[in-house]
């Protein structure tokens, strides 16, 4: 068995981590030890925030739908209840898109919900 020196693989590993840490402030982008910790932490934040992103967007859609619904004299919760009773299966993303970009279609959806509640 020949002796294996670690220089090449260690250098490659260090380069990989430092490349990932490019753009970080101070030692985080220059010192391998610190950069490695920063990259690991960044990965944790990225993983967590991919989950949080879904919650954030859902709440944004709800805010938009509520604002648009109140212009038609109905609250968000009443609108959703009316849509469920009417059997309209539009998700919140689609409703928010209608509320922002297609106000006439949203008005028609609101009228359907109001009719189901009455």
From Swiss-Prot:
GO terms for cellular component: ribonucleoprotein complex; ribosome. It holds the Pfam family Ribosomal_L20. This is Large ribosomal subunit protein bL20. HAMAP family: Ribosomal_bL20 (MF_00382). The keyword rRNA-binding applies. The gene is rplT. Keywords: Ribonucleoprotein, Ribosomal protein, RNA-binding, rRNA-binding. Coiled coil: none annotated. GO terms for molecular function: rRNA binding; structural constituent of ribosome. One of its GO terms (biological process) is translation. Belongs to the bacterial ribosomal protein bL20 family. The keyword RNA-binding applies. NCBIfam families: rplT_bact. Binds directly to 23S ribosomal RNA and is necessary for the in vitro assembly process of the 50S ribosomal subunit. It is not involved in the protein synthesizing functions of that subunit.
